[in-house]
């Protein structure tokens, strides 16, 4: 058995190392106590130095955001499961404001408002963070909106164009296609993403507030099936989440988008929808005992939306020239755009696309009311070619709507009014589009130009969409040079116009309508003119008996 030996030198050396590395430290920690907790709100006492919007840590890893800073207590919005909290629980300050991780790895993922992955594909690694409450870019940091943000929807790109850095409101009753318009806009960025050019690529963020979980899953599948998920991030705060999550979700989307914008990249953020965010904020404010105002909303609900939407901008070239385009969605009741939240957001944004339930029920989809919809800054971003071909489209449609209302009561119309009415019917039919089928700007220009030239006037109304689809397919196959000439929205040249006119006439010769009749009929026989007849005298001899 080996003998145990103790070396005094080793013991002395170990003690010396331990004492030399020891440095006395005194730390101070401010803690509070929960005095009440219910409905996602906690009242905490004993934290006199807490900051507004500071993160507080509760037992079990639950966090909250300090909102009401009263003299003797703090009103805290709980983020997460508040049912485990009870009176007497200890609360610690973190000294940090609410922030989320950001970066390229968030593309293709579904996250909650805290930036945590909820799609079952593992955690998202990120070395950067960005605060949720950030100052919007100042006036000197911006430049005018001049680049188009193509939606792929003819009615929007032609009449209410959207530019990169713009805030365009999508407003309408429930079930009028508001989300579909925004999803189609995301799908239309696929070709830009495929180029690999950072100046053309658009990163998309879809913020779902207060929707059913099944609806969010369906949207994710639609994006995945069409190859759009790889450049899209979904921020989900479904109806089952607490009011705190619904309130913060749009700010999470904005923070993620601003990170890319300040890197000189282009971003599209869709807030679906801000009505539910306002309702969640109203619930939080009432539970915090803040004084209610109109429709029981707190006095700062306008500031809630303005500070969010002001983050959309087109930065100047010194800051990289990045942009953040915002498409907020607002749900109305009975098409009432004069309610509190709709009027607030209309006054904040740069224009609105108004979707009407009556048009939707008539089969006009997207159900855009041209008379109420407007884009205040997008006109400068519209391509020159589209601006030329669609110049009179809005007026033609508005005149058609007026004439249609008049024709319902008038017994007889003059030929000019009848022709205008017939062309209006075909324009309405031409502007209809199926979901998840956005059109390129070149296809839109060709369709609208030909409609303006009257090439659809002799096509039956029920065949207009099929005629357009088959015509574009034929033109791509046989006259691809026209599309190359107008690529990117360049105006039509005289040669392209002449080529199109001939190509359409050739196509009409073989097009069969639904009832089997050709669009161009054989001309009716006409009597010969005097100059076309050769006159000669015929001598008739008669036999005499």
Swiss-Prot record:
It is found in: Cell membrane. The keyword Endoplasmic reticulum does not apply. Transmembrane segments: none annotated. It catalyses: ATP + H2O + 4 H(+)(in) = ADP + phosphate + 5 H(+)(out). Keywords: ATP synthesis, ATP-binding, Cell membrane, CF(1), Hydrogen ion transport, Ion transport, Membrane, Nucleotide-binding, Translocase, Transport. Its EC number is 7.1.2.2. CDD domains: ATP-synt_F1_alpha_C, ATP-synt_F1_alpha_N, F1-ATPase_alpha_CD. Residues 535-545 have a biased composition (Polar residues). InterPro entries: ATP_synth_asu-like_sf, ATP_synth_asu_C, ATP_synth_asu_C_sf, ATP_synth_F1_a_nt-bd_dom, ATP_synth_F1_asu, ATPase_a/bsu_AS, ATPase_F1/V1/A1_a/bsu_N, ATPase_F1/V1/A1_a/bsu_N_sf. This is ATP synthase subunit alpha. It comes from Corynebacterium jeikeium (strain K411).
